[in-house]
Amino acid sequence: MDLSSLSPAKGSVKNKKRVGRGQGSGNGTTAGKGNKGQQSRSGYKRPVSEGGQMPLYRRLPKFGFTKPNRKSVIGVNLSQIAKWIEDGRVSSEVGVEDFKQLCNASKSDYFKVLGNGELGTAVKITAHFVSKSAEEKIKQAGGEVILAERTLLEAERVRDLSTDEALLKPKAKLRKFKKQSKSS
């Protein structure tokens, strides 16, 4: 047996269908496209034409909406944080900016630390949310948990404070003003 004598199993490889190469090929003239008209031409075809039938997009009602200020929460496990520390991507302090960069997230995302995995070293973690099991494991390892009050985007918009300080400062509660009735 030589390399030159090798061939694929019989019937496993099909010949390519060469369309539009004469009547004798069985795929000549219209090249498998049927008769004349828009469907036989190259380029654009109407994607949702249903003839005279009421189209699907008009048969179904409108529903739902996308909340413009929705919270997007990204979960990060302790095992991921431990791996980042081993790889030298983060030091003993892991902040919201580190999460944003390493999770490929946006500035408006919230981060939650989850308890899957173990931490071998003491780590200071700043995140928006922390699960109970994660908090216990971090404290057992000698670490510290700090809860951030704002997203990075919100913190950047605070003029008086640096981004790090603004992350930790609670948002001011809005005061509701009551309309005073006119006394006559």
Swiss-Prot record:
Key word rRNA-binding present: yes
Keyword terms: Ribonucleoprotein, Ribosomal protein, RNA-binding, rRNA-binding
GO biological process: translation
Keyword Phosphoprotein: no
Biased composition (Gly residues): 21-35
GO cellular component: cytosolic large ribosomal subunit
InterPro entries: Ribosomal_uL15 (IPR030878), Ribosomal_uL15/eL18 (IPR021131), Ribosomal_uL15/eL18_sf (IPR036227), Ribosomal_uL15_bac-type (IPR005749), Ribosomal_uL15_CS (IPR001196)
Region span, Disordered: 1-55
Family recorded in the similarity comment: Belongs to the universal ribosomal protein uL15 family.
Function: Binds to the 23S rRNA.
Protein name: Large ribosomal subunit protein uL15
Species whose genome carries this gene: Prosthecochloris aestuarii (strain DSM 271 / SK 413)
